Design a protein with these regions (language model features):
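Short intrinsically disordered, low-complexity coil segments enriched in acidic
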Residues: 1-3, 133-134
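Extreme N-terminal starter segment of soluble prokaryotic enzymes
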Residues: 5-8
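Extended, folded domain segments that form the structural surfaces/walls around functional sites
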Residues: 10-11, 41
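A structural preference for short, hydrophobic beta-strand core positions in alpha/beta folds
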Residues: 42-44, 134
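Short beta-strand->alpha-helix junction loop in the catalytic core
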Residues: 119-120, 132-134
Length: 134
């Protein structure tokens, strides 16, 4: 028997105003496509939005090690915010959806990299060669 797939949570700073950009559109489209296969939701972490859950609220409600926390796979992607997001999500399943490179941070061992292109995959292959790369 196969284990059920984890639900996915895509972290974005917000979905309106100054956060509208290509990276946001990619995350929204990826979440929409994957929602046809597994439960998927966008989660904001800077701008509270009425229709979306907020990261700080979820972290309080679902402490590491709880059944709810273990059932989710968090997807982080927002360049300069990735190190802070990884610290906040320590102890939880997380993957990095890498749109580009050169942000100057190192990934902790074991964090999978989901690269959107060959150049990004090559960059992370050089700088995070022991992490799972896709």
């Amino acid at each position: 028997l196969r284990a059920p797939l984890r639900s996915l949570r895509f972290l974005v700073p917000g979905t309106s105003g100054r956060y509208r950009c290509g990276g946001l559109l990619v995350e929204q489209q990826t979440a929409r496509l994957l929602s046809e296969l597994v439960p998927t939701e966008l989660v904001t972490y800077r701008q509270r939005e009425q229709s979306l859950p907020f990261l700080a609220d979820l972290l309080k409600a679902e402490p590491p090690g709880s059944a709810a926390a273990d059932q989710m796979l968090w997807i982080v992607s927002w360049g300069f915010d990735v190190p802070r997001q990884l610290r906040a999500l320590r102890g939880r399943p997380v993957a990095y959806h890498a749109h580009s490179s050169g942000y100057g941070f190192r990934l902790p061992p074991g964090v999978p990299v989901l690269a959107v292109g060959r150049n990004t995959l090559g960059y992370w292959g050089q700088w995070a060669s022991r992490n799972p790369l896709f």
